[in-house]
Structure formats: C-alpha cells, structure tokens
Amino acid sequence: MNNIITLLILIGLTSCTGNKSQENPNNAVKSEFTEVIKEDYELYKPTKPIKAVLILFGGYPEVAEDVKREFKILEIAKEKDVAVILSNYNRKLWLEEDEKHQLARRLQEIIETHQLPTDNIYIGGFSSGGNVSLLVSNYIVGMKQFYIDPKGVFIIDSPIDLDAIYSTSEKNIERNFSAVSMQESAWIIETLGNSFGNPNDHLKEYEKSSVYIHRSDNTSNLQKLKSTKIRLYTEPDTLWWKTNRMADYEEMNAYYIKKLSESLQEQGFEHVEYIPTNNKGYRANGDRHPHSWSIVDKEDFINWMLEK
C-alpha cells in the first residue's frame, strides 16, 4: 500500500532544528498568543481565558514546523481562544506500554507547567500521528493517575491497521511497481516483522499494538474511548491512488478507517464520526495529494471542539 508507506518515509517534509528553547510573551501583544518553543514541543497560548486545548502530532517524519506549514490552524485557534500544543514526538506507528506512560506523563507535565485547563482537551494527528493520538488517549483515560482525559480524539488518514500494512507491502513487492515502492515495502516488512513477526503466524502480537485489526475486528486498544468524541478523517480518492500508486481501495487507509468507524458504532461508541472528504487534499506547496492535513475543514473542526 504505497499510500500508507509514503506517509511513513517519503512525505517529503522538512524538519526544524528542534533545539531552540525560548519563551516570547511579547508576541502576545500582536497575536494574542504567548509562544513557547521547547525541544520537544511548541505551545501557542491565548492571552485571554482558554476555551480548549488542542494537542497535535504530525506524520511519521513531521515536527512542529512541518505541522504549522501543512495545517494552518493557529490563526483560527487564536481567534477562538484555543491553546495549541504542537508535539515533536514522531516516528511511531505504535506505542509500547512504557512509551504510552512516558508520553502521557509528558503531556500532563506540559499542561501543568503552563497552567492550561484540563476540562476541554482534544488530541489528534495526521498519518502515524493519528495512531499515537488514539493509543495515548486510550491509555490516559484508562489510568487514574492522569487527569488530562481528552474530550475528543481525531485522526487524519492514519494507517491504523498494522496487519494490513504488512500484507499490502508484500503485494507491493510482488507488483514491482517502482524502485521506491520496493524499498518502502521492504522497510515496512522488516520493521514490523522484527517487532511482531509475520501477522499470518502472530496476529495476536499485532492485536496488542495496533489501533485496529480488520481481519479479526480487534479494537482492544480503543475500548476506554467509548464515551469520548472521535473523528476519523480520510479522503478516499480511489482514482488518485490507482493512478499514482497502483493501489486498490482495499489497500488504502480510507478503507480501514471506514471499517473501524463501522465497527465502533456497532459496539455502541455513540460519538464516532467518519468524515470522508472530496478533492480537499493538497500539500502546502500546492501538490495534489489526498493524504494531507488539508482535508480537515478547520472552522468546522474548531466548532466541534467548542460545542457544548
């Protein structure tokens, strides 16, 4: 599934330097934001009473600078008095238990340090950052030591099924569509294989770590989110993926995202929204790509966060 693989390695986004540490409250006079830049995150904090806190995770190689470039959310967040935390935490398709704990603890520390409200927190991300968002949110809600339970969680075209990624990579190698595809698919098979083995023989290992496994309809890593608002964004442009990656619909992130939404709704998750879009996916440089931050309607998204 070149669409899934592309999100991992060849998104083509640049990285920022990441070692800056500065606090610039003077910017608040002009922008009504206090800007805090640390090694592992950036915070944009409204100077007026904060109505909500938004925590964002980028795709596999993305850091805060990339997210700002691809997802122009800061201006409307400022207008609506929403604090935004842009995390530099990346390069994760899944989270081990200790990683969930460390990340949850770090998010709580950030919220404590900057005295952010905890009654209206939203966590989400693009691509693999969506996987991180769902997994850490489920962990936070299930652990009493944390008091930063998200009110809502969202993903943007995320590769939620690790079993599917593995099997699609095998198909990509068989197709031999391009050298890039071969390299990407080999990397996926090696990475997942070294961690979990072949899913045909070790599906239980995949179920322990994956957001969702369609083959067995496993959603065990989401069960704590039954009362949490969930949005699942994707752009199922089958023509684009077939033309550019030789991918069928059943090999797209969109397919598994829709199946997940159906599964959760059947289980009684009452606040799940599946949001397919059409021709909204464009990179900041103007390139057409359905696997993009831009598929999210930002005004509608902020209104969703602020609705009572």
Set out the residue ranges of the language-model regions.
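Sec-dependent N-terminal signal peptides
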Residues: I4-L13
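Short beta-strand element of the alpha/beta-hydrolase
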Residues: I50-Y60
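A domain-start/cap signature at the N-terminus of enzymes
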Residues: C16-A52
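Primarily recognizes the serine-hydrolase "nucleophile elbow" in alpha/beta-hydrolase
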Residues: E112-T113, D119-N176
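Catalytic active-site module of serine/aspartate enzymes centered on a nucleophile-bearing elbow/loop
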Residues: D287-K308
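Short amphipathic alpha-helix adjacent to the substrate-entry channel of hydrolases
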Residues: D66-I85
